[in-house]
């Protein structure tokens, strides 16, 4: 199959983009995650990047993609408020998988932001969205631009939240191809992959965390809570990286 023409697809309205991608998405749904990655590397344009928050199940997509593209840049948007265990997990996975880690941060430090704006995460949905824009969306946009990305791999799964329930394997976001090879995996498949490949969950998994982000907007799971309710005080599920 010939390489997809990103410029031509970007020129189409979103509805027409979706229609153009619908047929290939139907085919991709029938492939294994490994086959999807192979297909993407053969048919989608480089340069390629892989984003990771180094969350609970991050080792899956990091291992899956780097098995076929060892030198792919791995983008981390570091807010400065990650758990100590997350930074330790980043170091451990970077060493274990020999990751080409590329860390991007906000142009203002965490302390400077607090001095200027206060604790944005305590200022309702609007404050959380501004915090995410400063610390996640802008650094990611900068990463995609500086790394000249044309195809962006990510480890999102439909099972993680209602907002991800209808996501396709292949889409266009921010002018680049967005590719989600494990979008249809359930928790059991994740567990089996980790076990078979000698990989670990995030250290906080054993302490009852289902999803891990910043220290101030992540809660330990309690009976009766959904995974979505453990992040951003239940006000939001997405941090903005995978929206729009």
UniProtKB/Swiss-Prot annotation:
Keyword Ribosomal protein: no
Matches recorded under InterPro entries: PAPS/APS_Rdtase, PAPS_reduct_dom, PAPS_reductase_CysH, Rossmann-like_a/b/a_fold
GO cellular-component term (any): cytoplasm
GO BP annotations listed: hydrogen sulfide biosynthetic process; sulfate assimilation, phosphoadenylyl sulfate reduction by phosphoadenylyl-sulfate reductase (thioredoxin)
Catalytic activity line of the entry: [thioredoxin]-disulfide + sulfite + adenosine 3',5'-bisphosphate + 2 H(+) = [thioredoxin]-dithiol + 3'-phosphoadenylyl sulfate
Keywords: Cytoplasm, Oxidoreductase
EC number(s) per entry: 1.8.4.8
Pathway(s) per entry: Sulfur metabolism; hydrogen sulfide biosynthesis; sulfite from sulfate: step 3/3
Active-site residues per Swiss-Prot or TrEMBL entry: 239 (nucleophile)
Domain of life, source organism: Bacteria
GO MF annotation list: phosphoadenylyl-sulfate reductase (thioredoxin) activity
UniProt entry tagged with the keyword Oxidoreductase: yes
Compartments in which it is found: Cytoplasm
Homology family: Belongs to the PAPS reductase family. CysH subfamily.
Physiological role: Catalyzes the formation of sulfite from phosphoadenosine 5'-phosphosulfate (PAPS) using thioredoxin as an electron donor.
Protein name: Phosphoadenosine 5'-phosphosulfate reductase
